[in-house]
Amino acid sequence: VILTNNTALLEVLRQKWPDIPAKNWEIRPLTGLTQGSHYITDGVHQMVGRRQTWHGGTLGVNRQRENRILHKLSFVGIAPKVIAMHGDWLLLEWLSGTKVTAETFGLPSFQQSLAQIVANLHHHSPLGYSLQLKQQITYQWQQIDNRRLLPDWLRLHKLFMTAKMPTPLKIAPAHMDIHPDNLLMTSEGLKLIDWEYATDVDIGFSLATLFKGNQWSEIQQKTFLNYYCTYASGYIDIVLLEQKIKQWEPWVRYMMLMWYEVRWQRTKEPQFSALAHPLRLSFNLAF
């Protein structure tokens, strides 16, 4: 018998809270590029249910890893707390707060707050889950339609696979998917949600991902780094950090290109092809 998401989730809720009638639970899907998340309430409890799916696995999502990471970060105060891990389902607290708009996200005053929580995260000891970037890219490469792998792209891929990666400044935890939709301003301060891609990386790689993923201008990047490097938990040498971010930037672009290509391959949704297009152009891949 193939259970629908709601039926499978209801069974998990029934086992965890047997005294609550199944009809009392309200479940609705939450939006997101990788999907698989649901809002859950019985009128008293409020939770987020995040399911492990095969599709998410092709993008590197692992709910067991996410569960362990969130437990390790529970005292940092910038992430939702874990309620339970049951089978393929990760149940998290529902964070109430105000969504961060794209306009607010780019303001210097907000960048100051964001720089502080990123610096605090980078100050935490490694989580024990290092990003194996070349391994990830190799796996994603195998998911792409061979008809798209033209000679220029084959040469580019070989270049990245044989190139030496930049020497890390400092390996630290990173969220890896910071953008307005994954930020909430709560009564306890700024919080990050959706930690499914969290891993240990060089702080230069983490910041290059933040900057490139949000298309920040040079001024916005400089503003953020000025704040980041003034915090005790940040990195003191801004010049060295800027150099390292630049070294990582092409690797970040290639990582993003592979992610969008796999998403397009799996869903055929135009948004992923559109997101991949400027990245293809940046590598002179004309298709």
Model feature map: region roles:
Residues 5-21, 126-176, 186, 237, ...:
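An alpha-helical support segment within catalytic cores of ATP-dependent transferases
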Residues 34-43, 47-49, 161-205, 219:
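Active-site acidic catalytic loop and adjacent metal/ATP-binding pocket
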Residues 204-235, 250-267:
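Active-site activation/catalytic loop segments of kinase-like enzymes and analogous catalytic loops
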Residues 21-28:
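Conserved N-terminal boundary motif of the eukaryotic protein kinase catalytic domain
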Residues 258-287:
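ATP/Mg2+ or Mg2+-diphosphate-binding catalytic cores
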Residues 29-30, 34-130:
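ATP-binding pocket architecture of kinase catalytic cores
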Residues 235-249:
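All-alpha amphipathic helical-bundle segments outside canonical DNA-binding/catalytic cores
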Residues 66, 108-109, 191, 208-211, ...:
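Glycine-rich, phosphate-binding/catalytic loops in enzymes
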